[in-house]
A protein has these predicted regions:
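Redox cofactor-anchoring modules in respiratory/redox and cofactor-processing assemblies
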Residues: 1-110, 115-127, 131-136
Length: 136
């Protein structure tokens, strides 16, 4: 459960990043106290040499994320709507359809964390939908 690392494996001193859930759809952890559940698909521990330090730069409008999206969504548009708190627009553009596979972020030459912004926007849209349903 909560403290798997000390009980089941030993981290070396050069471990700098821990990702729970796998390399594509996983979430970086900030400490070792994150719970590991039955549904946790993997734990990835990276050293400094394995972590790319590529800073985020402005969007180039190259369209690589759009071409990579298996659902033919427009990740840059969805992420931008999330950044601007335009959740109605995000909903209208199909943000809830996104399966959060991460291919958009992986292919982005500007290193924009598209899937993280989309995930945030999707949570907000789902919350709005739930509130609308509760009001009726």
């Amino acid at each position: 459960t909560a403290e798997v690392a000390p009980h089941h494996f030993t981290l070396t001193d050069d471990a700098v990043k821990i990702v729970v859930g796998g390399p594509m759809m996983g979430v970086a952890q900030f400490d070792l106290h994150a719970p590991v559940m039955k549904a946790t698909s993997g734990i990835l521990v990276l050293t400094k040499d394995e972590v790319a330090e590529n800073p985020e730069t402005p969007c180039l409008r190259c369209g690589q994320c759009v071409g990579a999206c298996p659902l033919n969504l427009m990740p840059t548009k969805l992420a931008r709507y999330s950044q601007l708190n335009r959740f109605d627009d995000a909903e209208g553009s199909g943000i809830t359809v996104c399966m959060e596979c991460g291919t958009c972020s992986y292919t982005c030459p500007a290193n924009i964390p598209l899937v993280q912004w989309i995930r945030l926007g999707k949570q907000k849209v789902l919350q709005m939908q739930k509130e609308r349903t509760a009001v009726k």
